[in-house]
Amino acid sequence: MLELKNKIELLEKDNINLKQKNENLEKKIINIENKNSELEKRIELLEKKNENNEKQTNNQLIKSKIINIQEEKIILNWIPNRLKSTELIYDTSIDGDTINDFKRKCEGQFPTLVIVKTNLGLIFGGYASSAWKDKGPIEDFNSFIFSLQPVKKYNVTSPKSALFGYRYNDIMFQFGCCDFRISDNCTKNNNNYIFGDHYETGVRDLIKGDGHFWVQRLEIFKINY
């Protein structure tokens, strides 16, 4: 009898342990389900965001991977004439980042809009109404440099030296003599720089320190009026 009683007690304890394990498993399952539910909500939000971004990009006149629709509106207000459309003619992420890549895609093209994103996330660029060509200087009375952080436009002050095309061994193009320069292999080195010279005061302050920067991505659009 005593043995039987002990066995019954052991079985009851085992049963209690099993119940506790089952309860713990159920709690874990509930936690997993809750986490899955949260993940599903996050995925849904991300999908909606992507949809909105795609819609925004489709609505943009400037089909850029760098700027959003609000930033596009700012730039459009600066461009001298009302444009009908734009065409992406050069993108370092697709076409390469050398002088020859730029020359192949942009030689003779005008007017153009340059948009740059640095490795630190700064976004700026420039507008050129004259055609890109070898060397320079290239005269342009309508060119300007712009920044989106802070939001500011810098007009050309020396139109006869507004632009410089591909020249020497390492310069892809320049706005002004040294105001805004993009170098050969621009995404692989920090030989790109902003100094300020032939455009309105303040350009130099866009890049802190010595003015040099790495390009994360550079886009050039041909503008159609």
Tell what function each PLM region has.
Residues L2-Y225:
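Phosphate-recognition beta-domain surfaces
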